[in-house]
Amino acid sequence: MRNAIFIAGTDTDVGKTVASKAILQALATHNIATIGYKPVAAGSDKTEFGYRNSDALHLMKAATVDMPYEDVNPYALVLPTSPHIAAKHENVTIDYALLSNKLSKHKQNAELVVVEGAGGWRVPTSDSDCLSTWVKQERLPVILVVGIKLGCLSHAILTAEAIRADGLELVGWIANRINPGTEHYAEIIEHLEGRLGTPKLGEIPYMPKAKRQELGKFIQLDHLLEPDTVA
């Protein structure tokens, strides 16, 4: 079984946290020790404990291993914008070595670490780099979350191509229905099943306040739990 997976999205607000939480909840039913890891988050609220990102808090709640917030979300940037813009406004440099150190710590404490990305695959972390550089460095297998809406076919196919062009394994994809009114839903799913060339791990239906729901039942874990054969 893989010891870490990266959850990528076709865009921002397509359901990476919903899918990550669903995976964590499904793994919990198999008594697998898990940690949710949100290396970089943009959009955090001030609390008595410091700035906290709501997506990172959802991951903490769904995981089975307790870790300090600072380990789960090393960069809780305040502004809800692209990480490189938020970091620049806060005089922060996103250090990949720090992200790797936290990931190594998580791997020592859990059987599987679910690493949630930010934005889309090429989300910038500085004026000259993207978070995907760090994912490549760590050789993380990737699950792609597709927010089912008009335009998602091109976004999904392009993102899958970019992930593979970076030399990474696309181990599966998850459909997240973000708009109940999307027409031709079944045809969109059928096309993605034929084009992405990797197993569909689940379909998450539209539901209000999805992040607060029990989502594990929508995920099929068989492929995810197979032995890791990629060097």
UniProtKB/Swiss-Prot annotation:
- Which GO terms fall under molecular function for this chain's record? ATP binding; dethiobiotin synthase activity; magnesium ion binding
Q: Which residues bind Mg(2+)?
A: T17, D55, E116
Q: Where is the active site?
A: K38
Membrane-spanning intervals of the chain: none
| Localisation per UniProt entry | Cytoplasm
**Keywords of this entry:** ATP-binding, Biotin biosynthesis, Cytoplasm, Ligase, Magnesium, Metal-binding, Nucleotide-binding
Q: Do you know which CDD domains this protein is assigned to?
A: DTBS (cd03109)
Cite the InterPro entries for this sequence: DTB_synth_BioD, P-loop_NTPase
Q: Which GO terms describe its biological process?
A: biotin biosynthetic process
The EC designation for this entry is 6.3.3.3
The record's GO CC annotations read:
cytosol
Q: List all disulphide bridges recorded for this chain.
A: none
What is the documented function of this protein? Catalyzes a mechanistically unusual reaction, the ATP-dependent insertion of CO2 between the N7 and N8 nitrogen atoms of 7,8-diaminopelargonic acid (DAPA, also called 7,8-diammoniononanoate) to form a ureido ring.
Family classification = Belongs to the dethiobiotin synthetase family.
Q: How does it assemble?
A: Homodimer.
HAMAP family of this UniProt entry? BioD
Q: What is this protein called?
A: ATP-dependent dethiobiotin synthetase BioD
Species of the source: Vibrio cholerae serotype O1 (strain ATCC 39315 / El Tor Inaba N16961)
Q: Which gene encodes it?
A: bioD
